[in-house]
Amino acid sequence: MKKLFMIAAVASVIALLGACSGKKADLTVTSFTDELQDVIDVFEEKYDVTVDLQIIPTENYTTTLRPSLESGKGAPDIFTGEIVYLKDWVEQDYWETLSQDPYNVQDWESDYMDYVFDLGKNEDGEVKAVSWQTTPGGIYYRRSIAKEVLGTDDPEEIGKRFSTMEGLMEVAEEMKANNYRLFPDEGSIQPYTDGQDPQPWVNENNELVMTEARLSYFDYAKEFRDKKYTALAPAWSPAWYESFNGPISYNKGWDEIEEDEKDSDKTEVFAVSLPTWGLHSVLKEHATETAGDWAVTNGPTPYFQGGTWIGMYKDSKNKDLAFKFIEMLVHDEDFLEDWVKETGDVLSYLPVTEKVKGDFSDEFLAGQNNYEFFLEEAEKIDASIITKYDQSIGDLFGTEVGNYVEGKTTKEEAIKEFYKQVKNAYPDIKVPDEK
């Protein structure tokens, strides 16, 4: 398996040439990222088949794919689902039930982290989708800045400083005093306010759950803004990405980066909150100038974000081949061990994690064993709080926190508007101020 990905890369070129000749693919896979392309390359080489990967951007994924799944017209053989809508999709008649003959994936259950396997089940306990990943989060930080300002870059020591919200504020003050900013924007603190009292957005009585911990996000975000603890570089903006490489202009917002900006207007970001996949798809892709100057540690509370589940379409004409693909991706020990070595992806598949965790290291993190850290964080994940409303209600909440922080509304007005927006989107949900 050591050379398998290299061989597959050559095979993918050959497969591409074959695809150009108009030959119909043996299998069609639809996803929202290109992370499966390397998997497909290996699968094509192993089984001498062609696989067509269709990528739909995340923001359009559900609205584009759902009509095909419901009508059957143009539906893929295999498709992925993200955690934010997974709870909805496992209850729909889209994915084939995998906990039945001839698949019997229920026999795999003990090989996985409990929460990962459980999330792929519907309310009747049928397995509809499976995953190879676990996605706990942490705080990635710059080692050189940590040494300069805090006197150490040791992840355990920095984790102690980050272990409470008050500790985060203290470090933020020290960073600002040295012309650094703790985070790019206030979004990096939300996982830790939510984590103080983890609750589902909607409970079993169909009531919106607004906890004191969630309300505290308004206050912490406003304090971070007022005290200038962040660089005001919104998540996913050009300035946000650039902040991982070095100094950026303070309060750049969504504007493009200009090379001739004055140094006197600049600051440098110390850290950012990201889940496991953020290391590979964000930092390694965009922090090329600071590679090797990073480490990862805990925040005030554990959290997780994202994750990809995969299953086959219930009416696929290629179910045998589709299952072989799924089995290789999530339950082939040799493949997954090689996958970890090639990508650093943190697995939920225990036979491989037990093998690799002891001596794992990542050059980008100056040799840190982030694998062991994330596996320990994964043990703290409480997936019972996940609901099918998380993405939409979370977005509405974030919008109103932003309006308050920017001075567009009072806190009370923002909360009231949030309740109104939830009620408009989901009339059946009872909101706290409902009479």
Residue ranges of model-derived segments:
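C-terminal motif of bacterial Sec signal peptides marking the signal peptidase cleavage site
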Residues: 18-19
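Short, polar/charged alpha-helical segment
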Residues: 32-52, 397
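Extracytoplasmic "Venus flytrap"/periplasmic binding protein-like
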Residues: 46-112, 126, 148-150, 261-271
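Extracytoplasmic ligand-binding clamshell segments of periplasmic binding protein
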Residues: 63-64, 187, 199-286, 291-293, ...
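Hinge/lid segment of periplasmic solute-binding proteins
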Residues: 82-138, 147, 166, 291-298, ...
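Mature extracytoplasmic/periplasmic domains
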Residues: 95, 280, 304, 308-391, ...
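Helix-loop-helix "hinge/cap" segment bordering the ligand-binding cleft or interdomain interface
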Residues: 102-105, 121-189, 200-235, 314-320, ...
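Periplasmic-binding protein-like
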Residues: 290-311
